[in-house]
Amino acid sequence: MTGDSRAALLAALALQAEWGADEALLETPPDRAAAPAQRRPASPAAPSAPSAPGTVVRLPTAPSALGAASLAELRAALEAFDQCALKRTATQLVFADGAEDARIMIIGEAPGGEEDRIGRPFVGPAGQLLDKMLGSIGLDRGTVRIVNVVPWRPPGNRTPSDTEIAQCLPFLHRHIALVRPERLVLLGAVAVRALIGGKDGITRLRGTWREVAIEGLDRKLRALPTYHPAYLLRQPAAKRLAWADLLELRRECVESCVLRNSEMRDSQDFTKS
């Protein structure tokens, strides 16, 4: 192989990685010399009304999402759901972790590589940091419920699209309605966009409580946005702000009797460990 051809192959590989491809799907290369099949020109699609920036448009989804009477039925409904293309590229469904009757629900973005391989949310480096963050205010996976907005890993760990979020959002709403938590913690911009919407980003919203309407619940839930642990790994200076958010979560839970003070150990600054 010449230097020029090797450089061309590396450039093509880098482009595929940028697009989100992270594995080869064909065992044999296609015959590019063969005549291409004739394709019928597609009819132009009708233009859709633009949505407001930062707003996720809800799409029609499987009725089993709203009809699930238990978490087991909800998981089965997700396993049977084929409208989200991410299911075809992911290794498996990453459903949830933690207590099924938790009073605090942690909502992340989407599974990464480790989560896709193991089948549990937040098990990679970001998950290890999340465990440390929860432990700093006396919580752990046995006292919270952990779930992602999108339960399948996007190729290349890219950010889920608004369409993918909208396809999975009814299942997230049903998950919340079945667990019936008292408080939500929204980790990162995707969770905020899915449940709060609007134009404001996570930097502006973090640390302030918002009310979120959930289908299937007769009351709004208070939700606290904060930084995603993966972001904190890339930007360690933001850990101080996340620590302030955790202290606010602890204060709210104790003062609102969501959790008794005895259920939450003394706070220990996770940024110093």
Where are these regions (language model features)?
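A polyanion-binding, active-site-adjacent surface
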Residues: 7-10, 15, 22-261, 269-273
